[in-house]
């Protein structure tokens, strides 16, 4: 069956295959079809070796899968289904808070498909940002001829910001504070060229104001930094502390340079 499906996919020109509910293939049992297999992970490895044999030249994305073994796929979904609302962004980022390190295991942490329809502008910005700081994003709306005009306009507005898209290089952000009582809403990444990126999400229905010490972000508090908020394009400077205001159900993301 796997060989037959692979032949069909290759004839159709597909280069990407998503494999879902993979954990089911690692379940323990009293016995397996192949009598040489005696554990769930043995069975999983057997199946994944077949997958690699028939789909190894494609981009393979795993969902609801064991973290390990990890060498059969390029990417793994960091959580389960996430859609278009702020609660979905929060859900994705809760998984990122504890799973950001998996970008060292897989080439990409997958935040699930980014859906723009039936959401506010702030929710769209937040959901796209949750994708790029996880490491990659795949658009999930209907862009066919019969698809919604509104969605296509949203896509042109929110999926074509070059500076936002450039962040999605496979390297995940990590939480500023990863062990609080509530979902983490601050994430940071330091790049090798000296740039830093800092994202603040507001999951609430009212405006958020906060002050963040630059030292807490891994920056030198004695230096002055140039900042650019990448959704609005607004530029500013900061030294010692960074004053941040985030509208209700929205996000800000700063590029920080000396």
Each model region followed by its residue ranges:
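Solvent-exposed beta-hairpin/edge-strand motifs
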Residues: 215-233
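C-terminal beta-strand-rich structural cap/linker in extracellular carbohydrate-active enzymes
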Residues: 237-258
